[in-house]
Amino acid sequence: MPIRVPDELPAVSCLRNENVFVMTSSRASIQDIRPLKVLLLNLMPKKIETENQFLRLLSNSPLQIDIQLLRIDSRVPKNTPVEHLDTFYCDFAQIKEQNFDGLIVTGAPLGLVEFEDVAYWEEIKEIITWAKEHVTSTLFICWAAQAGLNILYDLPKYTLKQKISGVYRHTTCDPFALLTRGFDETFFAPHSRYAGFPVEFIQQNTDLEILATSEQAGAYLFASKDKRVVFATGHPEYDPNTLADEYHRDVKAGLAPQLPENYFPDNNPNKKPLVSWRSHGHLLFANWLNYYVYQITPFDLAQMNPTLD
């Protein structure tokens, strides 16, 4: 899927070097096609790295996608140039009157922070509530999944004593589920979180359909029956070295982190990790875009009332 982004976005050259089809705004403007409008609320500290990861996964299908990057934290960033944010990101006030086909809310390193202590918690609540009327389907990733469950289903924060970190085997729950169509019966995905998502906890407190689980990591994929909200509790977007970078960062900070499970060859942190989750990540995003966004979103976004046949 050609992703439509500003001509000067750093991800353009990065992804083109990987042979990923990126369509700049200038080229897309000459095509008479209604692109899917996807809003990416980027909560990760390293904005540019996260942009690359998600744009890579959004690029692998034949439809055109118009990506809008959204920020809500007005504090001076430590890991991303202010000029980059000012050039490529919008504030919520600039888009709140618009409708979108899809919204992706990324993870955030806030696993041990209470919701009410998050600096932009009120803004998160406003956007997730806004999305119910303005977005066809919303995809929550990792910490955002926990935040979404709290805001939409009033579920309390479920924090584990020990961080889940590593690459875990998962099993699909329904061979005919659209979100996992084409998945192998077992597949791998990275996790890096303190949040717990026990299967029974989700089943007993929501009407969400659980679509994939892990014995070690709990519920991984679950979604509403009307396809309006989707939760992925891991990080299918992670690069090969993201977990390694997090581990070595925490070692340098003196936090004595546990070694990510099922990740480093021979459990040796000096060896290069092998990727076992890339194909599943691409397929997950392709299925979400096709079955949860494209097939139910209205052609005219002014008529926002997506329903299922």
UniProtKB/Swiss-Prot annotation:
Pfam families documented for this protein: HTS (PF04204)
Predominant location category: cytoplasm
Pathway participation: Amino-acid biosynthesis; L-methionine biosynthesis via de novo pathway; O-succinyl-L-homoserine from L-homoserine: step 1/1
GO BP annotations listed: L-methionine biosynthetic process from homoserine via O-succinyl-L-homoserine and cystathionine
Annotated site, Important for acyl-CoA specificity, chain positions: G111
Compartment annotation: Cytoplasm
Positions of substrate binding: K163, S192, R249
Signal peptide: none
Keywords, in A-Z order: Acyltransferase, Amino-acid biosynthesis, Cytoplasm, Methionine biosynthesis, Transferase
Catalysis: reaction(s): L-homoserine + succinyl-CoA = O-succinyl-L-homoserine + CoA
A GO molecular-function annotation: homoserine O-acetyltransferase activity
Gene3D superfamilies: 3.40.50.880
Catalytic residues in the record: C142, H235, E237
Function: Transfers a succinyl group from succinyl-CoA to L-homoserine, forming succinyl-L-homoserine.
Family, as annotated: Belongs to the MetA family.
PANTHER family referenced in this protein's UniProt entry, alphabetically: HOMOSERINE O-SUCCINYLTRANSFERASE
Protein name, per record: Homoserine O-succinyltransferase
Lineage per the UniProt record: Bacteria, Pseudomonadati, Pseudomonadota, Gammaproteobacteria, Enterobacterales
